[in-house]
């Protein structure tokens, strides 16, 4: 089997998940496991590996859906914004990057193994609610759309135009948000 070709380090999590799954299938629980960072597993196409072994997964690639990364490069940041944050290493996950991610693209005919998408926000990069809001908004709108809209129906121009309506909502709620994708009033 494919399991026999893996190193012990890579095979052990699969073995443990299968071990715990077998005795509990009578009550139909959903077994969830996280790829621990002990071997930097987040830099591999884990959705493909999970599908190869018959596991369902929630798609959360770091290079697309980690919302603690900067929204734009430091050179593109508006100096008038209260917070421009995110990881300071130059890593960027823009609204466009999030929106253009197709969670099923790497699965081909195995799309049944995709349970959904998840955006991660590691809050050690934020000091208060305003910074957290800035990191999330408006990328949450892009994440929401990729979660429910088939890739064939996505339209960046349409999304960008619809996104403009959120500016007045964010302002009315006194939320801090990245204004890079909003047209001047």
Language-model segments: which ranges?
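Single conserved hydrophobic/aromatic residue that forms the stacking wall/gate
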Residues: 1-10
